[in-house]
């Protein structure tokens, strides 16, 4: 993938789309061959790969802001620069007014946007999206996928989306 390129992988349920992302993320080890990113082999917990799942996995007992900082806390990277970056992402993507809200107070689309910011704040080299809109109703899915597509394009990061929805893939990706 080139910088800023968006690739979609389309297929029916059970065909191995999520398994492929798990291999790319280093969560699974290939039986043969290897997977590299920037010439380096990927491994579990690699900071180079950001992974956005089907469910947002926001923790209800934490505010949106604290949820966004979770990965930085785990990595022990809560630097002033990273906190400023988190604040900028909240503002840029319209969640600054909801920084103190709990996840249950947000719509499904806003929750997905918070999950994406949580991924972007870690500044990965590659973004993986595993059917991140599948839990949303049709109209919300259209709006959120358009918003998130714009966010990803503006980030300049390459991204891989897996989906079973061909129209979603075509509307978001540079290549399918």
Where are these regions (language model features)?
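The feature captures the beta-strand-to-loop junction immediately N-terminal to the Walker
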Residues: 10-12
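Short coil-to-helix segment of the ABC ATPase nucleotide-binding domain corresponding to the Q-loop/switch region
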Residues: 62-69
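Conserved signature/switch motifs of ABC ATPase nucleotide-binding domains
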Residues: 101-104, 118, 122
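Conserved H-loop
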Residues: 156-162
